[in-house]
Swiss-Prot record:
Annotated protein name in UniProt: 4-hydroxy-2-oxovalerate aldolase 1
Family stated for the protein in its record: Belongs to the 4-hydroxy-2-oxovalerate aldolase family.
S-S bonds: none
Residues where Mn(2+) binds: 23, 205, 207
Any single biological process term in GO: catabolic process
Membrane spanning residue stretches: none
Pfam families listed in its UniProt record: DmpG_comm, HMGL-like
Entry annotation: catalytic residues: 26
Key word Plastid present: no
Catalytic activity: (S)-4-hydroxy-2-oxopentanoate = acetaldehyde + pyruvate
Length: 353
């Protein structure tokens, strides 16, 4: 059976996934409470959001010293979300090497029905066994090719083929750094669509670090993407994700059906999601540097922490992280960069005297 048959639904042309409760976990330092998750899931479900992603920001098993500890165990939040949603499916993210096969099984037992497996865009092969397990369990599968801006479209399409052959039903172009600009999205999505045909759908996950999350998502749809991510109020890492409420407004205006009510999702963003945010997701200097330099969006909070600890500018940390082409999982190298900048500052002060 082709993906056209599996995913056909007369109420949408594009299926939306709200990732406020996963990508937003980065912005909230993984401190979601059960009350917040229950309220947000209920509001998104009422608005007609078909898929809601719930996990630690770094996926199953992400609660750790390296990534940050969760206030509430993620499996409890997945279970609560599944019990709260009346129509929406609950998705969960896992990164091979962070999460395990047992984590996937537990998430399914707690009500998760869509397994989203993420790898760096050149390492799709590490996801093969996890896709195999997810399909054996009867889970819907989605693949994330993170930091998709770092390799050309034809190389990305080859990696997408690895995921599709392993059992992935939709492969995402993931602009983890918010670094892609319009045609960069279009070319990558088109390459994946051409490679995968009816074997798997193509999706797009954008960030706002250059202010292009919505525009890039429109480009993705016009190039053939059938699944799109966003977060209410841009609740995500860096400057946040493409705001779902804005995406729905734009899609309504250009005739792309999503099945989500614009006014209900605007209400959810304003009245339910916003109060759960520690602050608005800002397109400030730090976020812009990440988009401009191609830095993984979740590095923001880690860079701010090391900036405060060592007394060095966060935007300089982020720029050097981009120069070194660091990827997700290498957040600890920000400490080395901070020490390097600190030494340069100290030697400069000494030389001045």
């Amino acid at each position: 059976m082709s993906t056209k048959d599996i995913f056909f639904n007369p109420i949408w042309d594009v299926r939306m996934t709200d990732t406020s409760l996963r990508d937003g976990s980065h912005h909230k330092r993984h401190q979601f409470t059960k009350d917040e998750v229950g309220a947000i899931v209920a509001a998104l479900d009422t608005a007609g959001v078909p898929v809601i992603e719930v996990t630690h920001g770094d996926g199953l098993g992400g609660s750790s010293f390296n990534y940050g500890f969760s206030k509430t165990p993620e499996q409890e939040l997945i279970k609560l979300a599944a019990e709260t949603a009346k129509e929406a499916k609950i998705a969960f993210l896992m990164l091979p090497g962070v999460g395990t096969k047992e984590d996937i099984k537990e998430a399914q037992n707690n009500g998760g029905s869509i397994c989203r497996i993420a790898t760096h865009c050149t390492e799709a092969d590490v996801s093969i066994q996890h896709f195999g397990l997810a399909r054996e369990l009867g889970l819907e599968t989605v693949g994330f090719l993170m930091m998709s801006h770092t390799i050309p479209p034809e190389k990305l399409a080859q990696q997408a083929r690895i995921m599709a052959d392993a059992g992935c039903q939709c492969v995402y172009v993931v602009d983890s750094a918010g670094a892609l600009v319009l045609e960069g999205v279009r070319d990558r999505v088109a390459a994946l669509v051409a490679e995968l045909g009816d074997d798997a759908q193509v999706g797009f996950h954008g960030h706002e670090n250059l202010g292009l999350g919505v525009a890039n998502s429109v480009e993705a749809v016009r190039a053939g993407a059938k699944q799109i991510d966003g977060s209410c109020r841009r609740f995500g890492a860096g400057a946040g994700n493409a705001p779902v409420e804005a995406l729905i407004g734009v899609f309504d205006k250009i005739g792309v059906k999503t099945g989500i009510d614009f006014f209900d999702i605007a209400d959810a963003a304003e009245e339910v999601v916003a109060p759960a945010m520690p602050a608005e997701c800002l397109l400030d200097r730090n976020a812009l540097i990440m988009g401009y330099s191609g830095v993984y969006s979740s590095f923001l909070k880690h860079a701010i922490r090391q900036s405060e600890r060592y007394g060095v500018p966060a935007h300089q940390l982020l720029h050097r992280a981009g120069q070194r082409k660091l990827i997700g999982g290498q957040e600890d190298q920000l400490i080395d960069i901070a020490l390097e900048i600190k030494r340069e500052q100290d030697s400069g002060a000494t030389a001045a005297h």
